[in-house]
Swiss-Prot record:
It is a peripheral membrane protein. GO terms for cellular component: plasma membrane; respiratory chain complex I. It is found in: Cell membrane. NDH-1 is composed of 14 different subunits. Subunits NuoB, C, D, E, F, and G constitute the peripheral sector of the complex. InterPro entries: NADH_UbQ_OxRdtase-like_20kDa (IPR006137), NADH_UQ_OxRdtase_20Kd_su (IPR006138). [4Fe-4S] cluster binds at residues 78-79, 144, 174. It comes from the Bacteria. Its cofactor is [4Fe-4S] cluster. Binds 1 [4Fe-4S] cluster. This is NADH-quinone oxidoreductase subunit B. Its EC number is 7.1.1.-. The lineage of its organism: Bacteria, Bacillati, Chloroflexota, Dehalococcoidia, Dehalococcoidales. Keywords: 4Fe-4S, Cell membrane, Iron, Iron-sulfur, Membrane, Metal-binding, NAD, Quinone, Translocase, Transport, Ubiquinone. The keyword Iron-sulfur applies.
Amino acid sequence: MELNFEKPLSLLTLDEIDQQEGGVIQSFRTGHTSPYPDPADWLNGEEPPPGVFITSVEKVLNWSRHYSLWPVMFGLACCAIEMMCMAASRWDLARFGMDIFRASPRQADLMIVAGTLTWKMAPWLKRIYDQMPEPKWVLAMGACGTSGGLFRDSYSVVPGFNLVVPVDVYVPGCPPRPEALMRAIMDIHEKIDKTCILKR
């Protein structure tokens, strides 16, 4: 039932508006006296009708995070060039829901760290990581990010990003190809799908 006023709303008194609303509420209450049946009762062991999906809230949240990763840029060296190539039109990063790289960590949930990290830069990497909202994921790109790479023995180079921030996926290579980075993003998607959001 809808509110059908015989005269303009501005000319009605409050009592007339209350009567109309009361009628709508009463008709709604009389039509909704029993709870909706449990899906297991009306399915009777059959497949749900087209357009009906039975799932959990956790799976819906993971699905939405899976297709809306917002990466923050943290390009430190030559691997960042391959990260930029992946964002170009040839590899079409938009099909993964990642068409916009965020400049602010407060709007991102994936950090792609590409290149050689020095100890002088490490506190800033940690600070940007701490500013990202939960849940968040880190992707270490390249040999330098994985283990320090060619510069591992240098006094100023961090031998692996996992000494500064927790890393979810490593992409080997010097530099890794855009296809390898896309494979790593798909690995992060699989990790997101297995994430337990609700504590039991």
